[in-house]
Structure formats: C-alpha cells, structure tokens
C-alpha cells in the first residue's frame, strides 16, 4: 500500500499523523527502537516478523499473532500528540497534564469488513521507566510486549485494545461515574444468570483491580494486582464477572475487533 494513500486516509483520536522515517527529527530517530526501523523498512514483508515477536513476547494471545501474520499490510510510524486517556485525566484531575508528543508504531491491517481502506493499531514506545509494583500481575497475562516491543495496542479510531502501562487505572478510577460506593448489591454475570445479584461482602476490591484492556461501551478487563496468575475480572460496570483465563477473554475482545462475525 502506498505511503501517500495511507497518509491521506489516516485518522485518529490522538491527533496523530502518519510519518515517514525521513519525517522524524534527529531526537525522535535516536529514541526509536531499532526493531521498529527494521519493520518499517521491510514493507509488506513485515507480517511474519511481527507475528514471531508477538508469539515470543505475548504467548497467551496466539490468535492475535495469527491475524497479524495473515492481515498485516505494513508497519509504519505515527506522531501522536494527545494520549488516548486525556478525558480520564481531566476527570481525575491529577493526570490532566499528561499530554505527550511521541513517535508510535502503527500496524496497518486489512479491514475484513471492507468498510475502510485499512485499520490502524497503535503501540507506544516500550516502557523504559521503573515498573510498577503490580507489573507481575499484568505480565502474567500480556507477557513482555509492553517492555520489549511496544506499550499498548489500541485501535486507532476508538479507545479499544491493550492499554499502555501509564494509562492502566484501577477499576474504581475507570468507573468513577458508574459504581455506587454505597450500594449494597452489584449485578454481574454469574454462570447462566445474566444479572445475578452479588451482595457487597462478595464484591471484589475495585481499588486492587488494575485495568489492562478496554473495549466499547465501558467494557474493561482487569487483573487483581495482588495476584499474578492470569486471572481477573472483566466486562462492563453492570455486568462484571470473575475470569479464570483473562488472556483468553481479552483475546476474544481483540478478535471481535479484528475479525468480522460470520
């Protein structure tokens, strides 16, 4: 796919622009991971290499690797000037100044619904700061993708996908407007009962649930940051459910975005 064709059609919620390697400043070029440069310059042959990296670094999401191997058109770069959680930062106050300008990795993939010329998935720079205390909980689900390849994996046009480490809130922060702290009952998915009432004493501790992935309509998936065993909680604020294999549930969400239902 031609660069100019992608640039004309490229859009995003992060005020992002599609960039060529030659468009980068000297500082941006120096800060870019070497593997990114290799993938960008490999053109339409990047799919196999990308899939191999995913299988190595994020082994619990094999269907994502399979999709990328078959449907990655090419890898590119984007200069993004607003993080995808700027609205949440405004709500919480202490994150309101989190705006950044950075070069991000862009996956240009086929739109299997044939609605748009392509879909764009964005991964931010690998996380190089001191890892948070709850990192092992996230790592048990998503492996080393965020620290070794790129941080986060978000569909460009929506807040959907794997969150970057700095953007992982607790569930109580994420649903600050949705969860009533004084309620005595919470309605969740429980087996075949769509909205089973769970008494307060059986609620999870929302302040200990760290959100690592998001979908549409306030759907979220979270690890219990006191555990590192690929378990967690997920779905919506009024349909929350315990999950025994969190990676599989997150992969289902990503595949819903990537692969049309037949």
Model-derived regions: residue spans:
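A recognition module on extended beta-rich or small alphabeta surfaces enriched in W/G with H and D/E
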Residues: 202-204, 213-262
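A surface-exposed partner-binding patch
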Residues: 1-219
């Amino acid at each position: 796919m031609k660069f100019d064709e992608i640039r004309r059609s490229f859009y995003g919620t992060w005020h992002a622009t599609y960039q060529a390697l030659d468009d980068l400043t000297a500082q941006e070029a120096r800060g870019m991971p070497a593997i990114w440069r290799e993938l960008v310059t490999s053109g339409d042959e990047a799919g196999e290499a990308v899939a191999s990296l995913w299988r190595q670094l994020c082994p619990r999401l094999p269907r994502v690797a399979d999709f990328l191997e078959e449907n990655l058109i090419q890898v590119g770069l984007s200069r993004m000037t607003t993080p995808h959680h700027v609205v949440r930062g405004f709500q919480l106050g202490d994150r309101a100044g989190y705006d950044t300008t950075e070069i991000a990795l862009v996956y240009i993939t086929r739109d299997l619904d044939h609605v748009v010329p392509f879909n764009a998935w964005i991964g931010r720079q690998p996380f190089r700061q001191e890892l948070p205390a709850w990192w092992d909980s996230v790592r048990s689900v998503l492996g080393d993708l965020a620290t070794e390849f790129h941080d986060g994996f978000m569909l460009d046009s929506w807040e959907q996908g794997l969150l970057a480490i700095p953007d992982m809130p607790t569930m109580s922060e994420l649903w600050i407007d949705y969860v009533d702290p004084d309620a005595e009952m919470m309605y969740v998915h429980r087996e075949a009962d769509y909205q089973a009432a769970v008494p307060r004493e059986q609620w999870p501790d929302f302040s200990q649930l760290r959100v690592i992935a998001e979908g549409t309509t306030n759907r979220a998936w979270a690890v219990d940051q006191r555990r590192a065993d690929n378990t967690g909680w997920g779905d919506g604020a009024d349909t929350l459910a315990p999950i025994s294999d969190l990676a599989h549930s997150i992969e289902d969400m990503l595949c819903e975005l990537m692969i049309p239902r037949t």
